[in-house]
């Protein structure tokens, strides 16, 4: 069984064939984290012997050493001097809790979370631990789900007010793990607009370290993920303990190293600017967190997260399907287009084997620049005299699918919607509004706003008979205040916004099950498992420069699979960086994502169009392997100027290897690149050259990479097993 309970020892053992996660009740009251790692039969060591420090007995604030015990649901105020998972302000103003074991339940399957995205789990098994503070009546349900086929534990917490007076949550995290600080380093993903998810590894030191967002979105600046390991951890060797979060709003991911070298790792909703009132009988559900253990380094960790996402988080028609090759008109035309120009671009796209034409920003209201019309999702008849329906009919008539851009969460001050409902935006009455990109944020905590968005977006999708939607969000939140909440509940706005967003996404994606949805947030500003639950892919970054995309996509692959990464071939010089890279390189890098084009095809010479046609044929033939193969990082752009990665089929009979140089250097010899994931006993043929290599040879000696000729040269190899 995946979950075993020993009543004599009061031990819960969550397990599959590869991992164990063990919880022990101490004194019959406190759930203690005893072990997490490689599969074991049992742990007999006494956690009390290990965690008691006799020299500090005189300073203990509790009958048990809560300040040193590795707790599953720690709280501050009754002996533990570290920050905890939960903080509840009670009617008398105090916040101390003494959460003690009350009961437990072991369930087949994995319950869904009401109002929140979560991983499916028909084959999983779930432990629910119920704890209670007798003084206040606050009760907690800790849920742990273990899967048979992936080395991930899904966790969440539900808080219930069973008392007689209202209480206020001021912190409610999703997961906490106390680990021995043999994990000497922390890896996170940080960045900014146009350089999202850069890999940052730092030594763990006493005190707090981690990543967070206070922006109302998971953000360009941080990703809700962190990984702990020894300093000897590599991509393929060493133990890694990682936490990630299925949530799209402000978050907090933190490791605190205490005076005893215990590392407390926690992740969940950002406590800053958060509170939530629970009246008697009310409950609060936290987002879901994922705890991943890998004995095979960071690559092993990534593949577990990729399997979690692909098998259990993404949903719908496109979760495991090939994706249409698209061209997006944004960098081809920006706001300056008409129907004739769009049809010219679409006709050219059809000629080179593209499947989907996407109309980006500027089709609605009177939006000739970015300072108007958001919220007015009505056709601009100046640009589209036949409306969306007329354009869509013509695009479909060419044999292409038709896609459309929206930014439904935003409102322009210069819009009919704002003139009719100025109170619908997030704002503080009496204060000057702070615009970003000339826009304000709609208040998704309000039912009437959510209903308007669902109806307006659905109507436009139906008019345009769309096959694809790009759902954008180009600014973060500030000036936090909702006219729909009283003064005592304003700190609920951030989370209520995200709950409102999820309600909208559930409604729209359910209404249009055959439409491919791609999320976007000024590029990769909301790239998280929460959005993946509703939309199987996300625009990875607004930066389409191939060399910078190597870093962005390499970092993104730490947590998210190739099938989620929106990646396009764009024009040169690149519109964000001014850099020029070869077409073959731009294509090779875009094949590390969902693949598409973001340029004016009508301006390209015949030779480039012919090359694009050949590339599209190649991508379509290889797409199942590229999107859904086992992904391995081989050479890090964060450790030099070169990047390499590969995808291997599940049966290990086929692989695609990509290597990208940085700026060329003189007098360099060809490189040897050791591969991963192949069958050591098989022979593999390079489809292009016809050369045959042994799998063991490729994984030890390596594959020869030709020396660079020109800056940013890419080389790809398609390897197929020889029968």
Question: Over which residues does each language-model region extend?
Answer:
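Polysaccharide-binding surfaces and accessory modules of carbohydrate-active proteins
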Residues: 5, 9-13, 17, 31-256, ...
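Conserved, mostly hydrophobic/aromatic
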Residues: 18, 157, 281, 327, ...
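Glycine-rich, aromatic-flanked loop segments that form ligand/cofactor-binding clefts
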Residues: 70-72, 77-109, 233-251, 292-317, ...
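Short Pro-Gly-centered flexible turn/kink motifs
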Residues: 88, 96-101, 276-295, 713-720
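Carbohydrate-binding surface patches
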Residues: 235, 637-679
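Aromatic-lined carbohydrate-binding/catalytic grooves of carbohydrate-active enzymes
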Residues: 318-455, 468
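Active-site neighborhood of glycoside hydrolase catalytic domains
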Residues: 385-387, 425-580, 594, 599, ...
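C-terminal beta-strand-rich structural cap/linker in extracellular carbohydrate-active enzymes
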Residues: 695-723
């Amino acid at each position: 069984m995946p979950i075993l309970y020993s009543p004599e020892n009061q031990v819960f053992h969550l397990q599959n064939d590869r991992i164990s996660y063990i919880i022990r009740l101490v004194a019959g009251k406190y759930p203690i984290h005893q072990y997490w790692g490689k599969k074991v039969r049992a742990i007999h060591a006494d956690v009390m012997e290990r965690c008691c420090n006799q020299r500090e007995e005189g300073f203990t604030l509790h009958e048990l050493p809560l300040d040193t015990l590795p707790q599953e649901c720690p709280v501050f105020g009754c002996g533990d001097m570290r920050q905890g998972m939960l903080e509840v302000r009670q009617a008398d103003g105090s916040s101390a809790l003494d959460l003690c074991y009350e009961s437990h339940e072991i369930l087949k399957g994995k319950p869904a979370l009401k109002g929140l995205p979560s991983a499916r789990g028909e084959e999983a098994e779930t432990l629910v631990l119920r704890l209670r503070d007798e003084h206040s009546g606050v009760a907690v349900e800790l849920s742990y789900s273990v899967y048979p086929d992936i080395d991930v534990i899904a966790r969440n917490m539900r808080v219930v007010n069973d008392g007689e007076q209202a209480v206020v949550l001021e912190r409610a995290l999703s997961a906490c793990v106390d680990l021995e600080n043999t994990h000497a380093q922390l890896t996170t993903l940080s960045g900014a607009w146009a350089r999202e998810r850069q890999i940052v590894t730092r030594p763990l030191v006493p005190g707090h370290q981690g990543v967070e967002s206070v922006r109302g979105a998971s953000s360009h600046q941080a990703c809700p993920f962190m990984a702990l390991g020894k300093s000897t951890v590599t991509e393929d060797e060493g133990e890694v303990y990682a936490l990630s979060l299925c949530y799209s709003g402000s978050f907090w991911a933190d490791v605190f190293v205490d005076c005893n070298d215990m590392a407390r790792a926690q992740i969940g909703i950002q406590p800053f600017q958060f509170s939530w009132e629970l009246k008697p009988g009310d409950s609060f559900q936290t987002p879901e967190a994922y705890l991943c253990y890998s004995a095979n380094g960071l690559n092993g960790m990534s593949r577990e997260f990729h399997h979690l996402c692909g098998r259990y988080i993404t949903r719908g028609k496109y979760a495991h399907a090939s994706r249409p090759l698209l061209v997006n008109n944004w960098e081809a035309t920006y706001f300056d287009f008409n129907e004739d120009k769009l049809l010219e671009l679409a006709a050219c796209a059809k000629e080179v084997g593209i499947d989907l034409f996407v109309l980006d920003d500027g089709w609605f209201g009177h939006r000739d620049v970015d300072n108007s019309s958001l919220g007015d999702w009505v056709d601009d008849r100046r640009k589209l005299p036949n409306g969306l329906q007329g354009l869509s009919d013509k695009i479909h008539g060419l044999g292409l699918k038709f896609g459309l851009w929206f930014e439904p969460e935003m409102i322009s001050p210069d819009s009919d919607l704002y003139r009719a409902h100025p109170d619908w935006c997030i704002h503080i009455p009496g204060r000057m509004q702070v615009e970003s990109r000339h826009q304000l944020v709609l208040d998704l905590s309000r039912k009437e706003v959510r209903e308007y968005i669902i109806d307006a977006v659905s109507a436009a999708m139906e008019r345009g008979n769309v096959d694809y939607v790009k759902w954008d969000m180009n600014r973060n939140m500030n000036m936090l205040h909702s006219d729909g909440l009283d003064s005592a509940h304003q700190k609920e706005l951030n989370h209520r916004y995200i709950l409102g967003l999820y309600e909208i996404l559930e409604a729209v994606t359910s209404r249009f099950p055959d439409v491919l949805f791609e999320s976007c947030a000024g590029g990769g500003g909301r790239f998280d498992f929460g959005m993946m639950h509703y939309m199987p892919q996300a625009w990875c970054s607004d930066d389409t420069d191939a060399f910078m995309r190597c870093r962005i996509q390499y970092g993104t692959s730490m947590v998210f699979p190739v099938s989620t990464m929106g990646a396009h071939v764009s024009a040169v010089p690149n519109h964000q960086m001014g850099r020029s890279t070869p077409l073959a390189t731009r294509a090779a890098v875009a094949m590390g994502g969902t693949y598409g084009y973001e340029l004016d095809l009508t301006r390209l010479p015949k030779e480039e169009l012919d090359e694009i046609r050949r590339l599209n044929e190649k991508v379509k033939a290889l797409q199942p392997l590229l999107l859904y193969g086992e992904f391995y990082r081989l050479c890090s752009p964060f450790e030099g100027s070169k990047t390499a990665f590969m995808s291997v089929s599940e049966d290990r009979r086929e692989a695609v290897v990509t290597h990208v140089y940085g700026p060329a250097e003189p007098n360099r010899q060809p490189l040897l690149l050791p591969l991963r994931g192949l069958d050591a006993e098989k022979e593999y043929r390079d489809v292009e050259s016809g050369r045959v290599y042994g799998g063991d040879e490729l994984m030890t000696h390596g594959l020869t990479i030709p020396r660079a000729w020109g800056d940013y040269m890419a080389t790809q190899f398609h390897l197929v097993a020889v029968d």
